[in-house]
Amino acid sequence: MIPHSENPFSIEDTYVEEPQFSEQCGNSRCGQPQTAYEVYQRILLRLQAQEHTRSTEANEYEIRKKFWIASFTGRPLQYQC
């Protein structure tokens, strides 16, 4: 954009551009005004989801390990509900 005057801080020359990669942002709030609380909540939810995924993967690993050990030792498997 070429300014119409020599004053670089003229109100007419200010504009807000559309975010360039808005399609790639998915469900994020790229380019949208947010409060610090909203950002904190989104980060907290994302971290909790990641932790749940990690704990699920760890549990699956432990179950596979128990199956593998039981297949060699002939021990019965015990499940915790």
UniProtKB/Swiss-Prot annotation:
Expressed in ventral cells of the blastoderm and/or in cells of ventral origin. The sharp lateral boundaries overlap with snail (sna) expression. This is Ventrally expressed gene D protein. It comes from Drosophila melanogaster (Fruit fly). The lineage of its organism: Eukaryota, Metazoa, Ecdysozoa, Arthropoda, Hexapoda. The gene is VepD.
